[in-house]
Amino acid sequence: MGNGKWIWYGAGLGSEPEYVLFRKEIVLESVPESLLLSISADSRYILWINGKRVSRGPVRAGGAVRYIDTVDAAPFLHTGVTVVAADVIHYVGDAQTAARFSAGPCSILATGQGGLLLYGDPRFDTDEGYDCLALEGYRFLPARIAGYLGFFEEMDGS
């Protein structure tokens, strides 16, 4: 599987959905023709390299299945400082929580612990070298009528 580790901010299991940003700067002396990276998250991610959106996912799954996406990062790289970043939303819960429609969209079954996993090149592998920031002003509001649709999202930009 590579040397990337599942990473998340903090140590505890959250009881509310969370939106967390991850970022790492990497210095590249040259750009390879191809650089395959594998990525997954609990529950959803958007991968950015040098400010360009590279991928979003993972493919939705339920139960014990966890999909990992593979992307070619080479077209997004340049020599010098390269910034790799990911936005990750974690919908908390387990099968019982999902059955009550209080874990997020019913097509995305989550676990109690959020996470990001990236691997394929040691410079990019997720580890303690990533900075992370939980977005405190981002809230998930429960749906009032049709809970199976998931949450409404609210951003406080102040």
Feature annotation, model-predicted:
Residues 1-11:
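Boundary/junction segments of secreted and surface-exposed precursor proteins
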